Amino acid sequence: MFAVIRTGGKQYRVTPNAVLKVEKLEAEPGSTITFTDVLAVGGEGNLTIGAPVVAGASVTATVIAQDRLDKIVVFKKRRRQNSRRKNGHRQHVTVLRVGDIVAA
């Protein structure tokens, strides 16, 4: 069974026991999060697509850790003008383990 959920402005295809890195969510490690923005649920040859969400469907996940991704370097240079700028940042993410997928 699989589901497509929406969180942080992105869509993720999840299966039970999958480990997933999503945009930072305000939750402590060990806590449980329920996603109700389920866009599609499928498995065993059937697929339910929501318009825009599947009514009554939900996905639960457990927070494993709050982490940061590798550094992204942003470098801008203007040729022949001795002008350059270097910035960087590390994106905050929440690491989740998907639990149950409940279809309507």
Curated annotation (Swiss-Prot):
Gene responsible for this protein: rplU
The protein's name in its UniProt record: Large ribosomal subunit protein bL21
Subunit organization: Part of the 50S ribosomal subunit. Contacts protein L20.
A molecular function (GO) term: structural constituent of ribosome
Organism of origin: Granulibacter bethesdensis (strain ATCC BAA-1260 / CGDNIH1)
Pfam family, one: Ribosomal_L21p
GO BP annotations listed: translation
HAMAP family, A to Z: Ribosomal_bL21
Alphabetized UniProt keyword annotations: Ribonucleoprotein, Ribosomal protein, RNA-binding, rRNA-binding
Function of the protein: This protein binds to 23S rRNA in the presence of protein L20.
Family label: Belongs to the bacterial ribosomal protein bL21 family.
One cellular-component annotation, GO: ribosome
InterPro entries, alphabetized: bL21-like (IPR028909), bL21-like_sf (IPR036164), Ribosomal_bL21 (IPR001787)
